[in-house]
């Protein structure tokens, strides 16, 4: 297979610099583009390594599907500045879409989101007509459990490194309401007629098959559900899930 052109780059979002990895298809010429949205980090200081393996996925999409692919770190993770908030991460996704739109030969922009990144990708797609379609992998339908106790969530966010600035947020309760207000089921109907691809492992311990089914159904005829037998929550490490995702990308129609 041909090599891709890849570069480490940055994106500006609300004046915050986000770190990113862009992979370019080897064949050159017009091609569709996709932004890859990561989920929440886990473990102490996990934000520093958040999305560390996503550039590999971007490279593979560019190489095997012939797409422009962008793996970026939302604010508060990886090499990106800023602090986590739902509104901030949604702004970061919009900034990634704008970045891809500026590629001269990009033929439309799609989103791929994993875990919580998939949930926010659904919200972003519903709100932004520039986005041609969305794939959500192992994505929870809401963040209500996260937002139920804002103080505890903030403690977690500081522990993993998603929130670094003293005094942030100005209002813990308002910050928490932004988290608990996330509802992919309410957003999904607004995606149609653009496609929503929902991928779930049948052994996922965090998101159930029924959760995924309800999300796909919420998009009506635009929704498509695929299940990976025996796969857990870390779908991006399962070759069957990756193959299913790439098959979906191959079926998309560029502008």
Task: Report the location of each language-model feature.
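Short, surface-exposed "cap/lid" segments of acyl-processing enzymes
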Residues: 26-64
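N-terminal cap/lid segment of alpha/beta-hydrolase-fold proteins
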Residues: 1-28
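Alpha/beta-hydrolase active-site loop signature
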Residues: 41, 74-78, 141, 232
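The alpha/beta-hydrolase serine catalytic core
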Residues: 18, 128-255
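Conserved alpha/beta-hydrolase
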Residues: 56-79
């Amino acid at each position: 297979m041909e090599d891709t052109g890849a570069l480490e780059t940055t994106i500006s979002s609300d004046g915050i610099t986000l770190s990113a990895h862009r992979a370019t298809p080897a064949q050159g010429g017009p091609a569709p583009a996709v932004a890859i949205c990561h989920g929440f980090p886990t473990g102490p200081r996990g934000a520093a390594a958040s999305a560390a393996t996503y550039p590999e996925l971007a490279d593979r999409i560019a190489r095997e599907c012939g797409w422009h692919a962008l793996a970026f770190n939302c604010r508060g993770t990886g090499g990106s500045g800023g602090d986590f908030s739902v509104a901030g991460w949604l702004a970061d996704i919009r900034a990634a879409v704008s970045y891809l739109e500026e590629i001269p030969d990009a033929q439309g922009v799609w989103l791929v989101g994993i875990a919580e990144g998939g949930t926010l990708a659904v919200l972003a797609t519903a709100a932004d007509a520039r986005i041609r379609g969305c794939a959500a992998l192992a994505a929870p339908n809401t963040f209500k459990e996260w937002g139920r106790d804002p103080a505890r969530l903030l403690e977690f966010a500081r522990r993993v490194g998603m929130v670094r600035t003293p005094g942030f947020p100005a209002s813990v309760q308002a910050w928490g309401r932004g988290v608990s207000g996330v509802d992919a089921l309410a957003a999904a109907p607004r995606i149609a007629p653009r496609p929503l691809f929902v991928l779930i492992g049948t052994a996922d311990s965090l998101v159930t098959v029924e959760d995924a089914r309800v999300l796909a159904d919420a998009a009506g005829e635009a929704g498509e559900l695929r299940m990976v037998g025996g796969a857990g929550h870390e779908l991006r490490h399962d070759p069957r899930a990756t193959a299913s995702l790439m098959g979906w990308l191959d079926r998309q129609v560029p502008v």
